[in-house]
């Protein structure tokens, strides 16, 4: 069994990477990266279904050797990615500045044109499989073809062919981003980016290109967590055990059907046995009255119910460790909505998703720094990073009725500010936006009500609205007006 404990972070103590030391830094980094690459490749093949059970060998009755892959690794990654990235990541303006809000809307339009939602999904796939992923952003040379074209291009890199080298100083800043390709002639071509330089190096350690650049390091790492552990990496022994048990169950059924025959006190030749297998019957007699002849099957059937209990227990453990909901949970007439959410593990799934959000946002801010710089240099979009907030828009429908009741109760309490009600009811992914939209809607409704009232009573009096009231200027109504 392969022991996997997360990916290694690549460090260098070089203060500045130059033509004189870039090859040395690359060689040392590549040695560590190749270890990571071998593990990532193993995890990726495991995710696709190429798992150790397919290569098992049996010494006893090797002709009965079923290999069953229950690809729970694929299930774990698919759920995690779907739950985290089911809805596109959005950029939201901080504050009430309309100019900033319009610029952020334009930034979201840029991301839509670049199909960033699909590329975020690719990033999340690699993060949950390999424990880390990489994104690259470069200026788009054809960005002026259309006005709404994003001035930058976004790429999702294969973590088996890319890595980032960090410094050992305080904060471990990124020193160099590397991606490489295998050419048809078998040569490896490395593209190395530092903060102010670009190098192109072959695996013969010749620097083919060396030129200055002002963009910075366009390769950003998106680790899944600090240990860079994949989503199913920590339960690999359990997943292998489930495969083994399921394969052995099929072996047990097949061995029961193809049971061995026991000949007790029966003298049988090879030809007689072949005839038995072909005809399905045999004639024999006792050798001696005291030595009874007997032919029977050697059978020992596997207890399927106990085996299923073992499989269910291991699967439940996998779900608990990975923070996934149990879709086969029991039910009770006394369960409340909150109890079901807690019991079936949906609260744990949400907690893990929020943990992944924090790691994603940290790297996404580095990506935004480069993106906003490109948009400023090549376009007319001027935005500060501090004016943009990254929002995950997962649909928050769990226990929605109870949350709505809490919101109504808090809004009806005159001692609670409405903004606090929106923030703490748990109903909205972005309480501030929901509050602002609701306040604008309430003002619009008040304005419409005033306009409707003024149209119904253009003179501003109350007489026409009262039962039996008369129009102004007639009868007693006019007299009372004169007295006033």
What is the predicted function of each stretch?
Residues 1-150, 462, 478-484:
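Extended, helix-rich architectural segments
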Residues 208-344, 348:
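Extended, charged amphipathic alpha-helical segments
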Residues 117-126, 249-257, 303-400, 411:
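C-terminal amphipathic alpha-helical
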Residues 435-484:
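Extended, compositionally biased alpha-helical segments that mediate assembly or anchoring
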Residues 121-229:
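Extended, regular secondary-structure scaffolds
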Residues 400-456:
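Charged substrate- and nucleic-acid-binding regions of tRNA-handling and nucleotidyl-transfer enzymes
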Residues 11-22, 29, 140-144, 264-280, ...:
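Charge-rich, acidic-biased intrinsically disordered regions
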């Amino acid at each position: 069994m392969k022991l996997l404990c997360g990916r290694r972070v690549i460090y260098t103590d070089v203060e500045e990477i130059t033509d004189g030391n870039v090859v040395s830094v690359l060689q040392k980094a590549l040695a560590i990266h190749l270890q990571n690459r071998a593990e990532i490749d193993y995890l990726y093949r495991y995710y696709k279904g190429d798992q150790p059970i397919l290569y098992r060998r049996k010494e006893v009755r090797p002709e009965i050797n079923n290999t069953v892959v229950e690809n729970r690794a694929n299930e774990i990654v698919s759920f995690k990615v779907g739950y985290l990235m089911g809805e596109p990541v959005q950029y939201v303006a901080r504050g009430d500045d309309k100019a900033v809000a319009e610029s952020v809307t334009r930034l979201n339009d840029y991301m839509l044109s670049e199909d960033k939602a699909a590329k975020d999904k690719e990033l999340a796939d690699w993060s949950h499989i390999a424990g880390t992923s990489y994104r690259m952003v470069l200026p788009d040379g054809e960005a002026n073809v259309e006005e709404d074209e994003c001035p930058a291009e976004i790429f999702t890199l294969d973590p088996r062919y890319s890595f980032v080298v960090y410094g050992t100083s305080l904060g471990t800043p990124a020193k160099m981003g590397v991606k490489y390709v295998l050419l048809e002639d078998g040569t490896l071509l490395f593209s190395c980016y530092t903060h102010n330089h670009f190098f192109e190096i072959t695996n013969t350690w010749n620097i083919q290109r060396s030129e200055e650049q002002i963009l910075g390091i366009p390769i950003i790492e998106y680790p899944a967590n600090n240990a860079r552990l994949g989503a199913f990496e920590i339960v690999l022994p359990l997943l292998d055990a489930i495969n083994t048990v399921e394969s052995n169950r099929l072996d047990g059924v097949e061995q029961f059907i193809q049971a061995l025959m026991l000949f007790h006190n029966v003298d049988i030749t090879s030809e007689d046995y072949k005839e038995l297998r072909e005809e399905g019957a045999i004639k024999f007699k006792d050798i001696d009255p005291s030595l009874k002849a007997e032919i029977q099957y050697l059978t020992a059937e596997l207890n399927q119910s106990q085996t299923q209990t073992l499989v269910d227990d291991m699967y439940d453990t996998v779900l608990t460790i990975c923070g996934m909901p149990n879709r086969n949970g029991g039910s009770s007439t006394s369960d409340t909505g909150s109890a079901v959410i807690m019991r079936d593990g949906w609260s744990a799934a949400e907690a893990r998703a929020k943990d992944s959000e924090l790691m994603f946002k940290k790297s996404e801010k580095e990506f935004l720094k480069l993106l906003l710089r490109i948009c400023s240099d090549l376009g007319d979009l001027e935005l500060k990073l501090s004016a943009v907030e990254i929002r995950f828009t997962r649909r928050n429908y769990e226990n929605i009725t109870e949350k709505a009741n809490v919101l109504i109760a808090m809004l009806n309490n005159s001692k609670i500010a409405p903004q606090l009600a929106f923030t703490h009811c748990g109903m909205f992914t972005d309480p501030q936006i929901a509050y602002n939209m609701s306040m604008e809607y309430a003002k619009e409704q008040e304005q419409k009500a005033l306009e409707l009232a003024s149209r119904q009573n253009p003179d501003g009096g109350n007489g026409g609205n009262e039962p039996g009231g008369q129009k102004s200027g007639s009868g007693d109504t006019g007299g009372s007006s004169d007295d006033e």
